[in-house]
Amino acid sequence: MSGRVCLECGSPHPGAGDFCADGCRTAFNNRRKARGAELYDLFMAHRFDRTRARQLRVLQAMNRLASNWRAEDHERRGSRRSWRLPQDVLETRPYLRAIVTIDRTGRRAQR
């Protein structure tokens, strides 16, 4: 058996994936969904309502959420990570790496 461990329950498993069973994958993704819902509004304010976000210290709040979630991972999940690897996210969404430029006429172009 390889040294792979399920990201959710911590059980060793022989597969190539990150989870030993569908239930573990579902629990992992449900936790990501709930945490993401908490983070979404704060991030959008941080990005698009910068003045108010600074006044309310939104970036500090987002960092506190992440720290609390990581502490929860250490406490309840044997320190296993609770996020997808950045390269996996970017691999499935190549448009996130695109560079958008605007020419003199105001047209957008992607490289």
Task: Give residue spans per PLM region.
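Long, charged interaction segments in nuclear RNA/chromatin-associated proteins
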Residues: 32-111
